[in-house]
């Protein structure tokens, strides 16, 4: 979407285009959990992340893509990632930034779910060490 639009317009229209078939301007909420493919090769490529497309809506779908594009446009960014919960966002960040063997120093008054994830999930994988 053009950078010339004002914030109010971006709030409504960023990350979407009118549907070419129905001409609807609103973003539909995709409740589908699976998507079709043109052929087996396309399915293979999408599952291998070698081609863009959707294969399971819990991982990505057109509704989430529109949300992410809209959030990036509102913040003037190049991309955004939406998570279903705060703990998912925190773990997504930690798993992206931290490498095997890293040490995480965390305040002991962090949200209990975060401490539990760090001291449980991450420690069980022996990927990080928590100091709190």
Residue ranges with predicted function:
Residues 1-51:
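N-terminal glycine-rich, Lys/His-bearing helix-loop that initiates the first secondary-structure elements
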Residues 28-29, 79-81, 102-103:
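Structural motif
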Residues 128-132:
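Conserved small/polar residues in nucleotide/adenosyl-binding loops
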Residues 96-114:
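Conserved PLP-anchoring active-site segment centered on the Schiff-base-forming lysine
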